[in-house]
Amino acid sequence: MLIPFLFKLTLPLASGIALSSCGTLPEADLGTAAGNQTSSEPTNSVEIVQANQPEIKAVPVIDGLEHPWGMAWLPNGDILITERPGRLRIVRDGVLDPEAIAGVVAVSTVSAQQLFASQQGGLLDIALHPRFAENRFVYFTYSHGTQQANRTRVARAVFDGEKLTDWQVIFEVGQTKPGGQHFGSRLTWLPDETLLVSIGDGGNPPVELEGDFIRQQAQNRASHLGKIIRINDDGTVPADNPFRNDPKAAPEVWSYGHRNIQGLAYDPVTQKVWATEHGSRGGDELNLIQKGKNYGWPVVSFSKEYSTDQPVAPATSRPDMVDPLQIWTPAIAPSGLTIYNGDRHPEWQGTIFAGGLVDRGIRHLRLDENNQIIDETTISIGQRVRDVRQGPDGHVYVLTDQNNGQLLRLES
């Protein structure tokens, strides 16, 4: 029997560097802690007092998911959910179908032609085409290749309600990399039916590419690594991409200088794009994404090296690079992001819900008209939070990244 959880709300900083209660190993995405770490940066903490804060509870919808990663709602209210090991599941009328949806690319850790499901890699995000009712297109991100040479891919397929057909790769990262780290892989649509895709920087030291640590590719505009890319629904390059006509840049690049974005959301009310990004041993970020901008990694960062605990970068800010709006040290390992615009919870209108793997909860942030954070609370889930999304019914839904992962619904 699934029992509703009651969530504890803690009240950290109104602005500046938010302090959570956990640290990370090199793979914060895997959710193992390496002891608490404290920030060396100054903070201006203030106590936030919230009157009449409604109690928030998580109502379990289903369990029995193996490391779920992303979710998307069909027009009839059914939910498609990806599982990182390589399966696509469906929830029909609130019940998880015991059989996986057929038609997903096959899984292998040795064949370069199949889905690579190891460490952080596997079947990752999912998004329906904005005109799904007409074309039945479903989009996926996944890792492809082998332990020695792999990359992020974007594919689309046709879903007829029972199975996938016509699996077609429409984009792949131009360089292969070794290891199983930092695939990025969040998807979000813009109103013009172009698709934003986050691509990770490829991994932590000692992983190298082209004679240097692979993370340096985040500053190389000719590389897809460490970027947000923007493509048309068929994988072609939009005419107004910022570097389309730059011979020294990959034409798909939309923004760069990212480490590993696993929270990406478009706010239709403000027409802004938001992202949450994993740091290294702290320095997790919330960013407002702008076309063509440089977000600094690894040239500027609040992160520290896993091996030495020394700063990754010589500076935390530069005038030619975009500063984050929020920094979390110790790390929360952010994954999953939504900006609430539903009618069911008017008190949440315009607020941000950012999931955390190591944090085992959700950061709930309120902003002023200048996009400055004026309030942040922690909703403690007690499980690794992989994805957070607003459903068509106006509820906020949560996927927990566990062997027996759950789909939860937030209510107040």
UniProtKB/Swiss-Prot annotation:
Keywords: Oxidoreductase, PQQ. GO terms for cellular component: outer membrane-bounded periplasmic space. Its cofactor is pyrroloquinoline quinone. It comes from the Bacteria. Pfam families: GSDH. GO terms for molecular function: oxidoreductase activity. The keyword Oxidoreductase applies. Gene3D superfamilies: TolB, C-terminal domain. InterPro entries: 6-blade_b-propeller_TolB-like (IPR011042), Glc/Sorbosone_DH (IPR012938), Quinoprot_gluc/sorb_DH_b-prop (IPR011041). PANTHER family: ALDOSE SUGAR DEHYDROGENASE YLII, HEDGEHOG-INTERACTING PROTEIN. Belongs to the PQQ oxidoreductase GdhB family. This is Uncharacterized protein slr1608. The lineage of its organism: Bacteria, Bacillati, Cyanobacteriota, Cyanophyceae, Synechococcales.
